[in-house]
Every structure is written in structure tokens, then in C-alpha cells.
Amino acid sequence: MAATLLDVCAVVPAAGFGRRMQTECPKQYLSIGNKTILEHSVHALLAHPRVTRVVIAISPGDHRFAQLPLANHPQITVVDGGNERADSVLAGLQAVAEAQWVLVHDAARPCLHQDDLARLLAISENSRVGGILASPVRDTMKRGEPGKNAIAHTVERADLWHALTPQFFPRELLHDCLTRALNEGATITDEASALEYCGFHPVLVEGRADNIKVTRPEDLALAEFYLTRTIHQEKA
């Protein structure tokens, strides 16, 4: 069946290991409750009716994914990821050539709220470039002196945002920008940075700050708290 204008595919790069978690198990396979972090992240995407397919890019040597219920989900496609995030995203984009718009979501960002996702998806009505979920910087920001544990100066926090995911773009535009940026040796830290490199200005959609990425050991307990709270609120 051909994709419609309303249908959205999602790409989840899940080939990384996450050494800062200090565990032998890749962070996306750590459990919160009775699900892995990856399952929480993917189910949050599939909970929206516009998301019709999720492509998960995993490491070619990954033996854990096949043990998850996701492996047999009819809306899930699995592809081999690459050494870098951008390589995995490109592999996912190639698997959804029919899609007009794509979401890219971190495998280890399990606390996505449906209202944030809905507001992000709504930008496809007015934007030809796409945008990202982001949260305004609230803390005082310091720039350090290179190579020293010392403050160089305070960074003005006005107009500073924390980039979150999902990030949402026209598939062809994202594919072309990622390809160009990689071919030209640009540093790409997220999908929006590839569009920025090519001269585009994605929209900032304010999202909740509790949409955290599990990166360090202390993040796991915080994500568990946020998810438990959300489940209780939904049941209330």
C-alpha cells in the first residue's frame, strides 16, 4: 500500500553501545519495568496514528534484538546500522524510500510524550524544512577554557535550546543533507545539524524537558521515575 501524505515513517538508530553507561549491555537494552528502553522509545512512536512504520537500525552483530517482541511486530523493519549515527540514519532512510516525511528518534529516549509528538508532527502542514523537539535552556551556562577545568566566560542563555528527539524532516531533504555533509567531512551531531550545514533553518518546537536521553547511570533511575509517573497519570 502506498504511503499517504499523512503517513509518517520513523527511523531509530540503535547500533550504538553507549560506553558512558558503564555496563556490558548496550543502554537501549537496559530494562525499565518490564520493557527495554528501546521498546519504550519505539512504542511511544507507534502510539501516534500517523506513525505507520518504524525502521530500527541495529549493529550487524546484535543478538539481543531478536529476543524482543519488537522483532515480530508488523510495523517494524530492521536494517543494519553503521559505525556512526548518521550512517545508521541513512540506512533507515533508504528502507523508507516511499515516505515523504520521517521522524528520527533516539533509541535511548524513552520518555516521549504524545502531546509533544503531536505538535511536532503538525509542523508538516506549514513547513517545507521540518523541525525538532527542543527545550529552552534554564540553567546558567559556562564555557570552559580549553584543556582546563576553569571558566572562560558565562554564555548568554537567551535563545539557547537543548536539542531533543524526535526530529522531523522531509525524507528526501534529510537524505540529501546527510549525504552531502558526510561527503564533505562536516561534523554531524544530530539530523538538524545536517540541514543547518546545508543552509536550512529547522523549526524549534518546544518540548518537555523530561524527554531525557539515557546516557549515564543516573539517568536510568530518572527515566524510570518519569515513565512511572506518566503511566499513573494515564490511568488516573
Swiss-Prot record:
Catalysed reactions listed for this entry: 2-C-methyl-D-erythritol 4-phosphate + CTP + H(+) = 4-CDP-2-C-methyl-D-erythritol + diphosphate
Protein known as: 2-C-methyl-D-erythritol 4-phosphate cytidylyltransferase
Enzyme Commission code: 2.7.7.60
Subunit and interaction comment: Homodimer.
Entry-linked InterPro entries: IspD (IPR001228), IspD/TarI (IPR034683), IspD/TarI_cytidylyltransf_bact (IPR050088), ISPD_synthase_CS (IPR018294), Nucleotide-diphossugar_trans (IPR029044)
Protein source organism: Salmonella paratyphi C (strain RKS4594)
Matching Gene3D superfamilies: Spore Coat Polysaccharide Biosynthesis Protein SpsA, Chain A
PROSITE patterns per UniProt: ISPD (PS01295)
UniProt keyword list: Isoprene biosynthesis, Nucleotidyltransferase, Transferase
